[in-house]
């Protein structure tokens, strides 16, 4: 498959395609290292590195954007540069500590564990992106932009839920190992209440956020916020069960549930966007995440 194929698929120039693949190659190294830090409760180093990346990204972006007329390209490449530099450092660090590139036992285990997760993560990408693509193709670009604004505001809670899940996952694994199931139950109930309240607050104040930050032509987005904000609760609900499936290496169940949810989202969008317009995509998203969470 040549570069022209990827250019046609993503509708992007070659240098941005290469930048994207470089980021995909190096970003996992930081993910591997950060997961180790979380599981060993070594948060000081993780927080320090995260702050360094958070500062380097915008600072380099400002410098590069102000230094060229190609503003958008400069911002993208500066962001990729930061990710690649940090990723390269952690790749070298991991390889140095591991001192061994190939180990048949671990490679086989990693392949068997992660192979079913490839369709799972592709399906999750479909669930997150297909709405806007289908609205763009079936209704129009402006409606896709309005939906995108509503989706961004509605999913603000994901910043919180992702941090909560990253912290809760090591605790879950260690509690299962110690057979301390009661602590998992009590903390799970508490954080579910916190997330539910957060989603309700987004529903309540999301329209005000749009009215303040977006021009009038985007005000129609307020009707999409409630279902998409409710979807965030079920996005968070799934990993609580999924982490347990991961612990017991039952990744095939995760794959099947996510694939069903992704296919259902495409079908429901195709049917209901034609009938009710682009607003229907918010409700099909909610229905599919509910289906995904209970599957």
Label for each model-derived stretch:
Residues 26-48, 94, 98, 229-260:
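Membrane-interface junctions at transmembrane-helix termini in multi-pass inner-membrane proteins
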Residues 18, 47-96, 259-264, 278-295:
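Hydrophobic alpha-helical transmembrane segments
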Residues 17, 141-152, 221-226:
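Small-residue hotspots at the loop-to-helix junctions and early N-terminal turns
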């Amino acid at each position: 498959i040549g570069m022209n194929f990827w250019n046609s698929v993503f509708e992007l120039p070659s240098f941005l395609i290469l930048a994207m693949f470089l980021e995909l190659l190096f970003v996992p190294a930081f993910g591997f290292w950060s997961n180790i830090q979380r599981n060993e409760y070594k948060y000081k180093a993780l927080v320090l590195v995260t702050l360094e990346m958070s500062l380097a990204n915008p600072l380099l972006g400002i410098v590069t954007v102000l230094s060229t007329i190609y503003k958008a390209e400069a911002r993208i490449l500066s962001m990729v540069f930061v990710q690649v530099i940090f990723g390269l450092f952690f790749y070298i660090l991991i390889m140095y500590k591991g001192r061994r590139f190939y180990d048949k036992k671990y490679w086989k285990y990693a392949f068997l564990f992660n192979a079913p997760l490839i369709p799972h993560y592709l399906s999750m990408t479909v669930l997150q992106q297909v709405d806007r693509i289908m609205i763009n193709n079936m209704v129009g670009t402006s409606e896709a932009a309005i939906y995108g604004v509503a989706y961004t505001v509605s999913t603000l809670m994901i910043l919180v839920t992702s941090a909560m899940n990253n912290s809760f996952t090591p605790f879950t694994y260690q509690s299962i190992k110690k057979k301390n199931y009661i602590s998992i139950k009590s903390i799970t109930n508490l954080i579910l209440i916190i997330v539910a309240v957060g989603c309700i607050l987004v529903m309540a104040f999301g329209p005000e956020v749009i009215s303040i930050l977006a021009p009038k032509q985007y005000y129609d987005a307020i009707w999409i916020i409630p279902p998409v904000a409710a979807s965030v609760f079920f996005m968070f609900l799934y990993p609580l069960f999924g982490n347990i499936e991961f612990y017991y290496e039952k990744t095939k169940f995760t794959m099947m549930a996510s694939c069903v949810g992704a296919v259902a989202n495409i079908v429901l969008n195709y049917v209901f966007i034609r009938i009710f317009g682009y607003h229907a995509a918010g409700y099909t998203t909610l229905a599919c995440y509910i289906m995904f969470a209970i599957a």
